[in-house]
Amino acid sequence: MSPDFKETFFPSAQMREVRRADGTIIATPELPLVDHLCNIPLELAARAATHPEKTYLAERRGGPAAPWHHCSYGEMNARSRAIAAWILEQRIQSDRSLLILSGNSILHAAVKYGAMSARLPACPISVNYSLMGGDYGRLKHVIALVRPAIVFAEHGSAFKAALENVNFGDAVLITDDPGVLGRTSFRQCVSTADVVATAAGEGVDASIRAITPDEPTLYMLTSGSTSLPKAVIQTQRMLASNLAQGRQVLGATAGWGDRMLDWLPWSHVSGAYTKMGTLTSGGSLFIDGGRPMPGRFDETLANLKELTPKFFVNVPSGYAMLADALERDAELRTKFFANLRLALYGGAGLPQPLYDRFQRLAVETVGKRIFFTTGYGATETASGCMAIYFPTEEVGIGLPMPGLTLKLVPNADRYEVRLKGPMITPGYLHAEGEAERMFDEEGYYRTGDAAVFNDPQDLGRGLKFAGRLSEEFKLGNGTWVTAGRLRDLLLGALSPLIRDLLVCGENREWLSILVWPSQAPNDDFRRAIAERLTTFNEGRGASERIRRVGFLTEPPSVDAHEVSDKGSINQRVALQRRATDVARLYIEPCVAEVLTIDGDDRGEKNER
């Protein structure tokens, strides 16, 4: 019998289920969404009045060894009101925006809440758009799309090249030291100190009271993995309802009113959710300077030892790195599992072997397992709107949280996922006519994702991700390949031998994969990969059978958009960038560095 989970405090996940004659399934939580306020600046003001001295955000300034710098709820409210007052003085037209170039910081949050209070939509973007150099194509695209009247770059010296070489039109720049910049296109460059010194009065109060639930408050960019990013319109209603359903379902177990640690970028909805979810729960968020990548993860590990949070969130690659560290470091194991009650993963599926490995470590350390959950959602749904909040040992995408209605439309052996609820976007900025493609005839948002049941006879056991419909491709013989689902299966089969992989084979005779190995691929390692894949291939058809494996040495490139801010791989971009590696998989006869699986007599045989 498996050890118990640490105590959780989840509400009922009972669903009302309707099955139509055409196979379509409609699922709605029986539990209604709790009442909530559709005005985040008012939420901030209320928290500041209730506990003005409590830490809201904390950051390290000057590197991982620097002390934490704390910002209380009272300080955040005062600072954001000053910024709002300054914005209101600029008398900006309603079709403009505020563009945030900087990453996660206390000042970033104040600027964002200040823009909300002044009813000027804010658009936080990946720092890579401004820092990676080149022709700044994505940054220029965003500028043309959101038409910023104000640009915020916290440290002008860090963004100097972009600020001097990109045309920002007639925008005003807010930065720490305008004097470090040479010639720019900005109409005016203003110091941050001057902005936050602005006196806030009744004008700010009136602006906050005038906020309506359905006006644009944020423009959040899509990942842009297959095209230039779109700007998703996010409203106060979207954000508030999404935050409310998360608190209702996960908040008590996760301890969002306590200390939180998170690195996820605020230019992405998951990171932005954590920042605002902490606010609406009255908690304290410590901004993690670490990242789940070699050379950057040690800071996260040190922070975990210090803070020992109840809740931890990361991408699957981060959990793989954490499991490695936990196995090496007894002190980390003791401190990490001491208070942990809930672990959340996102960005990709969590391989079952990694889940089992993590639970083994938890049981060895504290005698109980840790409940894992995940959120399913998109930029268009504010953030995660489905979650695992019911007893299960299976990974997946869970069930709808209160307030969301799920529509499952049959698609071969899977279901297309469609969603409806107050957390769904009204559309994209400057994309008239797009709504007809975004929504079906009943008003459900078409996610483009597919799912299957963990148990076809029992919806209550939840759903699991079955790939992006847009990631499907055909082999040369016309056989369809569900690449997203296949990738998740392979990650599970090959964990922990590999970090990630690319599925190859579009218009080819057979499937191959390119993998990022977890160690140098010596003969023993190659043999282990071959044995795993030979077992994996047993009983599988051409749409899932892997014939060859290539080993990648260059890590996924952030600058080339191969990896998103949240750490997931953009398969299409990576395959295009590594076309030479893909072609090498199909050279005849097979080249020596490519591993052949399952008796392909055109290359190296599997040694068993």
Language model feature labels by segment:
Residues P52-T55, I174-T175, V180, R187-L221, ...:
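Conserved pre-ATP/AMP-binding loop-to-beta segment of ANL
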Residues L57-A110, S130-K140, S191-A197, Q234-R237:
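Conserved AMP-binding/adenylate-forming core of the ANL superfamily
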Residues H69-G74, I208-A210, T217-A244:
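Conserved AMP-binding A3 loop
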Residues N77-I83, V196-E202, P213, V232-T253:
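Conserved structural elements of the adenylate-forming
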Residues Y129-N167, R183-F186, A199-G201, N242-L261, ...:
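Conserved ATP-dependent adenylate/AMP-binding module captured primarily in the ANL superfamily
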Residues V190, D194, S281, L301, ...:
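Gly/Ser/Thr-rich phosphate-binding loop
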Residues A240-R259, S267-E331:
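Conserved AMP-binding/adenylation subdomain of ANL enzymes
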Residues Y415-L475, D601-G603:
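Conserved ATP-binding/catalytic segment of the ANL
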